[in-house]
């Protein structure tokens, strides 16, 4: 991710483009006892994974301040292709799941002007034009690259305090289906626009790792979301400040219980309801 200064608000884009963030989508059900912890349940691994996914950026070595929503999310689904009922159902399920994990108010709206999160179900034929009109991309080389190489895409914009105030997700349904990625596109892109923008092969099992074959939220993803929206974790925090706070949270009895139960809890809601 490359950032470019602006005066008042910031947009992020990955890979590349200033102050927009563009993402590409490329379990057991029992809760283990604490003595049976796997690698992703270890405190240091959780902290390192949080830094990797929340503060780092896919196409830049820059470590960013923490970004998160500090206001309710009102989402509008724009249907530019068929299967409206299915697309609405899976979107509602996953956003309700995210709301439950994070405590964020995530509310559907029929008013596109009121929405601060727009989810577009479209086709790959329309993608290049949508990158111009919905993502406001101007560089034709980037438009060509993203429209050819991306399965699904998302961006968000932040204010000067690093709070997220707007996001857009585009899912070209025919392309996503061709890659058997429709459900995982919905899960990954909508999760990333909450403030977990990076992908990393160092974090697994996770939807943020293209090599781990996780199409739906993992126990580790559940923990990262819980930490991101913990009251002590603030937008704008830098790595040096956030790491000791994360360690303190993780050592609390309440969060230790969450670590134990994460795999079980994450499987009880959202897209998993369609699979069980």
Describe every region a protein language model picked out:
Residues 1-15:
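N-terminal secretory signal peptides that target proteins for export/translocation
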Residues 18-23:
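Sec-dependent signal peptide recognition
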Residues 25-31:
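N-terminal signal peptide c-region/cleavage motif recognized by signal peptidases
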Residues 34-74, 81-83, 100, 150-159, ...:
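Disordered inhibitory propeptide/activation segment of secreted metzincin zinc metalloprotease zymogens
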Residues 59, 143-181, 197-276:
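Metalloprotease/metallohydrolase-associated module, dominated by Zn2+-dependent proteases
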Residues 78-80, 122:
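Acidic/polar N-terminal loop/beta-strand segments that form early-domain functional surfaces
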């Amino acid at each position: 991710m490359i950032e470019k200064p602006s005066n008042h608000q910031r947009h992020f884009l990955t890979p590349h483009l200033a102050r927009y963030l563009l993402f590409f989508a490329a379990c057991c059900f029992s809760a283990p006892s604490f003595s049976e912890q796997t690698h992703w349940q270890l405190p240091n691994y959780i902290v390192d994974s949080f830094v990797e996914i929340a503060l780092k950026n896919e196409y830049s070595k820059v470590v960013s301040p923490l970004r998160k929503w500090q206001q309710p999310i009102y989402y509008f689904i724009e249907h530019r292709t068929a299967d409206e009922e299915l697309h609405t159902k899976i979107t509602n399920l996953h956003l309700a799941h995210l709301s439950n994990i994070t405590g964020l108010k995530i509310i559907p709206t029929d008013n596109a002007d009121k929405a601060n999160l727009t989810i577009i179900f479209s086709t790959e034929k329309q993608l290049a034009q949508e990158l111009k009109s919905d993502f406001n991309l101007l560089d034709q080389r980037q438009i060509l690259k993203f429209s050819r190489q991306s399965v699904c895409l998302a961006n968000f914009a932040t204010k000067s305090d690093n709070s997220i105030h707007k996001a857009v997700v585009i899912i070209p349904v025919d392309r996503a289906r061709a890659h058997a990625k429709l459900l995982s596109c919905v899960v990954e892109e909508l999760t990333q626009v909450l403030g977990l923008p990076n992908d990393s092969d160092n974090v697994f099992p996770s939807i943020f790792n293209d090599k781990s074959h996780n199409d739906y939220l993992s126990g580790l993803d559940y923990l990262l979301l819980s930490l991101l929206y913990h009251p002590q974790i603030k937008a704008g925090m830098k790595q040096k400040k956030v790491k000791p706070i994360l360690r303190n949270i993780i050592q609390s009895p309440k969060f230790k219980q969450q670590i134990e139960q994460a795999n079980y809890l994450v499987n009880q809601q959202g897209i998993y309801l369609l699979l069980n």
